[in-house]
Amino acid sequence: MTDLTSLTLAEARDGLANKSFTALELTDAHLEAIERARVLNAYVLETPAQARAMAREADVRIAKGEGGPLNGLPLGVKDLFATEGTRTTACSQILDDFKPPYESTVTSQLWRDGAVMLGKLNNDEFAMGSSNETSRFGPVVNPWRRQGSDAKLVPGGSSGGSASAVAAGLCLGATATDTGGSIRQPAAFTGTVGIKPTYGRCSRWGIVAFASSLDQAGPIARTVRDAAILMHSMAGHDPKDTTSVDRPVPDYEAAVGKSVKGMKIGIPKEYRLDGMPAEIEKLWTQGAGWLKSAGAELVEVSLPHTKYALPAYYIVAPAEASSNLARYDGVRYGARVEGRNIVEMYENTRAKGFGAEVRRRIMIGTYVLSAGYYDAYYLRAQKVRTLIKKDFEDCYAAGIDAILTPATPSAAFGIGEKAGADPIEMYLNDIFTVTANMAGLPGIAVPAGRDAQGLPLGLQLVGRPFDEETLLSLGEVIEQAAGRFTPERWW
């Protein structure tokens, strides 16, 4: 029998439909794989009893010829999504053993469509990080290794657990969130596919907030088709989220394999950075060549305000975080550290409950929102954000269908490798991805090649608002040309 954990989500769906195996067998295979791969630290909570119960229910539906599009398919859930009655901590000590009394909209839609929950996945604390090293549960290990080395590498962040689990065959797909690149960067580091949908496409209700005007939920999967299948269930209007957009959800899977002939692909000159590694430059050129061979037209474009995106992002995001994280005070839920009075209790709780990176970002955010600096920093960053959005609008108005860029400035680096470095060095990992968040646009990261040490590298496509379908069509061209990427099992 085929190793059930090596199947794509689409293959598993077809296998269940033609009764090659049961949902329970599929779920058990993944639960066993999770047990064998605990060294990766991808899961912070395993839910085997719940998973088996959901799988049995799926098998009953299959026997009756009923069930939704994800019936019996085992998924992992980033620990940022509220799961009713199941511990949700955002991988922070301050949320301690919090069990939400409600389910996030995105996960409730997955369960509505028949998916099975295997457990909660590790992430950077409150989704703040680019390496999954800030989690209270410890770092996630990338299933990929450099050739000839057993050094542990980061999977990227903040959705490192999601990316690592998908790459290692510990789930068929996973939920993730992207505030400045937290879906696309881990996908690029692990040889998986990650989609950050248009802002407002997927509900944010029930997702622990980092920066509300930037956060967006999306899937990480093994293939473009798998990501499209998950997107269909995750997307949709939600009246509980005021930023959710009421427009029909298209058949994303139908876009996979569609011709890209005649599409105009923008190649932004500002993304050619000083000191860019030659292999990233080569990968980008190669990806553009694949799209051209498929019938697309390449056009050099200008996004002149790109150079301001990263500094503006690191003003806007911490400002929103300092506001969102003000609610964690130890009064109603989560951890509480007593003090002589209520103010001291707040201070003790927040000092002990938040990790160093979260404290750093709260302090930056509070500083830029303070009376003396609001105009100089926050207001100016919001103006820059408008200019970044206009750069993209001008490109699309000129007939560009999507923009092709590298996904990351390098392949995965070692755990602890940047621990003593200036935090800005870590923030530079987001250099190619933050613009899509600042402009609210959809982006996809697709594996496109490997570096000299055998590690996966990804390319990014950024599209028009609510045109994820074009990204899926283009992404599949790159996927077909580059082939599938699977790490060699060492765990």
From Swiss-Prot:
Q: Which GO terms describe its molecular function?
A: ATP binding; glutaminyl-tRNA synthase (glutamine-hydrolyzing) activity
Q: Which UniProt keywords apply?
A: ATP-binding, Ligase, Nucleotide-binding, Protein biosynthesis
The UniProt catalytic activity note for this protein reads: L-glutamyl-tRNA(Gln) + L-glutamine + ATP + H2O = L-glutaminyl-tRNA(Gln) + L-glutamate + ADP + phosphate + H(+)
Q: Pfam families from the xrefs?
A: Amidase (PF01425)
Q: Does the keyword Protein biosynthesis apply?
A: yes
Q: Which SUPFAM superfamilies match?
A: Amidase signature (AS) enzymes
Provide a GO CC annotation, any one: glutamyl-tRNA(Gln) amidotransferase complex
* Gene3D superfamilies associated with the record: Amidase signature (AS) domain
- The record places the active site at K78 (charge relay system), S158 (charge relay system), S182 (acyl-ester intermediate)
Q: What is its EC number?
A: 6.3.5.7
What are its GO biological-process terms?
Answer: translation
Complexes and interactors: Heterotrimer of A, B and C subunits.
Q: Which family does it belong to?
A: Belongs to the amidase family. GatA subfamily.
The record's annotation in HAMAP family points to: GatA
Role this protein plays:
Allows the formation of correctly charged Gln-tRNA(Gln) through the transamidation of misacylated Glu-tRNA(Gln) in organisms which lack glutaminyl-tRNA synthetase. The reaction takes place in the presence of glutamine and ATP through an activated gamma-phospho-Glu-tRNA(Gln).
| Protein's name according to its UniProt entry | Glutamyl-tRNA(Gln) amidotransferase subunit A
Q: Which gene encodes it?
A: gatA
